[in-house]
């Protein structure tokens, strides 16, 4: 199912997941979709390896945590999710050197907490890693310094950014 992108989220300079200047990071990009899912793309390489040719499980967990924590930005761009619980199930290995998609959505939103679920999807449409998480809502200003927001939190748009995502039916539920 093709779902249109409605907004690209910001990146930072040095975050391991989304940092554009972190030479060992994933340099992931995240997109808000019209159906209120959050999709992300990344291409793991040799620096992200666990077993030969496979993404390290801790890094798979980290990108799911990042994506689920960001999913609240769809509802409120001034709120960030700080992890209080993360559950991850590994189903299939995630290959290196291929464009990989992560997709997540909010499952419960309260006044102080929210919950989300996410999946790392293989190029063939299968879910490789699935996760659920619980997060506390905090303003970015409470998490970091004002200088970070001004100097290191920015939107990076590219000509080849996707305008839509082909989300497998299994991923959107």
What are these regions (language model features)?
Residues 1-7, 95-96, 107-173:
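HotDog/MaoC-like acyl-thioester-processing domains
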Residues 11-12, 24-26, 36-38, 80-86, ...:
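A generic structural signal for short beta-strands and their flanking turns/coil linkers
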Residues 40, 84-86, 102, 116, ...:
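Hydrophobic residues positioned within well-ordered beta-strands of beta-sheet architectures
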Residues 58:
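Active-site region of the double-stranded beta-helix
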Residues 64:
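Conserved active-site segments centered on acidic
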Residues 67-101, 107:
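Hydrophobic beta-strand-centered segment that forms part of the acyl-chain substrate-binding groove
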